[in-house]
Amino acid sequence: FDKNFKILRSKKLPKYSRGHGIHYNDFRSEFYVVCSYLDAILILDKKFKVKNKIQISKKINYEKAPHHHCNDCVSYKNSCYVSMFSKSGNWKLDSFDGAIMEIDLIQKKTVSTLAENLWMPHNPKIINGAFYVLDSLKGNLKGNNFNTIGSFPAFTRGLAHDGSFFYFVQSINRNFSKNIGINNITSI
């Protein structure tokens, strides 16, 4: 896109990949696309050619279905940080052990967990040298070593920062009924 949101270049992703989040890494001159149906990160060059794929886990190879609901990422130098609904891969069994996992881009594998105990996290960001993430279902903005720095009464995602203020979108979660009374979300 240009500054007026005119599409300058585009490319289709592989079939059944469901690209869900994207980040460009200046240090490595690569795009990272989080694909929730693949439980993987696609690495693309500047011309959008797929260079590689990094699996979040091997679970998809055994059961032929995604398990982690990976959705967004941010990268810094040789690491890519991916948010997901379930670190264990059991969100479909109502185990929302959400996390941000670090992927080593040289080794092409998951190497650590940056944050845990998140409920449907989205939009990990590095802002002024610090990590931030939306703990979406709880309606929390996390920062300052992943402490809650803001709480909002709706499902939150789409984090941006202009140097002074944070911006995000609030929406209704599709599965709200089972969460009534558990969190501070009031939108139904």
Regions found by a protein language model. Give the residues of each.
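Sequence-structural signature of mature extracellular/luminal beta-sheet repeat domains
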Residues: 1-188
